[in-house]
Amino acid sequence: MSRKGPSKKHVVLPDPIYGSTVVAQLINKILLDGKKSIAEDIVYSALDMVKEKSDQEPVAVLKRALDNIRPSLEVRSRRVGGATYQVPVEVKPNRANTLSLRWLTDFSRARREKTMAERLANEILDASNGLGASVKRREDTHKMAEANKAFAHYRW
């Protein structure tokens, strides 16, 4: 462990168009090979598509989608006496945000639409309505935690 104290958290500055740190974090998750301008184009065009399709504020739809994806429980492996148990633990808020953004981008990339902006927009819309692969991932995570509730006393 570090003797210098806890590591400093990286502060993400809000994006220039919507003034939202959530959008800035999404841009950073979409980012590949350091091409930030391309990532910004993808996210902003996806949010424009969300606005066209839903007639609602795109940042509000994105936040609702992330709330639907955000896990509250997960399982972590704990080795006890030669056996490895899947122990359910609560997810810290920072990790929950990171997981929801990661799942949103990963399952957007796995979709079948033609452009990444379309995939991201449709995944955001699906997640805001409680559908889509990213919401299913959260449900599966919660089911795993529920199934292993018997090992909750091993948590640390």
UniProtKB/Swiss-Prot annotation:
The keyword Iron-sulfur does not apply. GO terms for biological process: translation. Disulfide bonds: none annotated. The keyword Ribonucleoprotein applies. GO terms for cellular component: small ribosomal subunit. HAMAP family: Ribosomal_uS7_B. Part of the 30S ribosomal subunit. Contacts proteins S9 and S11. This is Small ribosomal subunit protein uS7. It comes from Bifidobacterium longum (strain NCC 2705).
